[in-house]
């Protein structure tokens, strides 16, 4: 496991530390979910061979530093009884605050259109594994409000926008946690240098012309999403965004104002807020 140390000034009432993880992608399955689910292991495990080891080491680091784990999604690669049991065992013994990714609700990885109806098939079972509301929640630590939002499907929803406005009303400095990074030219260029699409939220349509048709549909922002992104860009209480999804460590600046920090697939980012 790679460990990165980052210090972020935010106006905390006292310094504190969190461990930022993302994209662990546990790949447990057994015959309780049928052979099709078991077959996913051979396909998916080679992409995430160290997931179990990384999570265990992050857990030990959390205990050593007495620091909570703030996870920005894809802790599991797909929904299975074995994966959910592993997650529940971990969250029962560690302080974990979660912002979900798209894979938290993935049944067989890419077999169907991912939308609210698809997500809701497994939402209750996944939610039962975590102590916070995995669709939207807030947690205040030493005067800093960490707002977790589920944007795994490249969209914000109206209730999330209203929730965010309510959190702004608390008047505290805020750190947003979400799985999918928001569009930034630097991030876009990095992704498009080797991918057919950027896998970012809110990419301007003129920059999506060359996307594969299915990825264009998947990643096209709607009106609510664009409005909420503009709100985030302009709200001075929002100080940082913690993200994942792209599987590498990266730092950019959203809307030329908000530092956006991505933590990669086998990294534990130890962040001290001051």
Residue ranges of predicted features:
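Acidic/histidine-rich helix-loop elements
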Residues: 22-53, 106-130, 186, 217
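Short, solvent-exposed beta-strand-terminating loops
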Residues: 13-36, 105-106, 177-200
């Amino acid at each position: 496991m790679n460990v990165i140390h980052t210090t972020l000034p935010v106006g905390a009432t006292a310094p504190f530390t969190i461990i930022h993880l993302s994209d662990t992608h546990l790949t447990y399955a057994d015959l309780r979910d049928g052979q099709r689910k078991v077959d996913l292991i051979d396909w998916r495990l080679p992409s995430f061979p160290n997931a179990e080891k990384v999570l265990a080491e992050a857990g030990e680091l959390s205990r050593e530093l007495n620091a909570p784990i703030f996870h920005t999604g894809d802790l599991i690669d797909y929904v299975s009884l074995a994966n959910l049991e592993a997650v529940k065992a971990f969250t029962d013994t560690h302080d974990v605050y979660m912002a979900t990714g798209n894979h938290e609700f993935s049944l067989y990885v890419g077999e169907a259109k991912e939308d609210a109806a698809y997500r809701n098939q497994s939402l209750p079972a996944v939610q039962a594994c975590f102590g916070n509301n995995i669709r939207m929640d807030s947690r205040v630590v030493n005067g800093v409000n960490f707002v977790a939002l589920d944007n795994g499907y490249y969209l914000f929803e109206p209730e999330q926008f209203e929730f965010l406005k309510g959190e702004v009303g608390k008047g505290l400095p805020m750190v947003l946690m979400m799985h999918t990074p928001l569009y930034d030219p630097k991030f876009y260029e990095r992704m498009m240098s080797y991918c057919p699409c950027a896998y970012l939220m809110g990419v301007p349509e003129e920059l999506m012309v060359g996307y594969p048709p299915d990825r264009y549909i998947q990643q096209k922002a709607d009106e609510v999403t664009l409005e909420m992104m503009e709100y985030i860009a302009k709200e001075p209480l929002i100080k940082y965004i913690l993200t994942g999804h792209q599987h590498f460590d990266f730092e950019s600046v959203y809307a030329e104002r908000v530092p956006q920090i991505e933590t990669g697939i086998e990294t534990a980012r130890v962040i001290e807020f001051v």
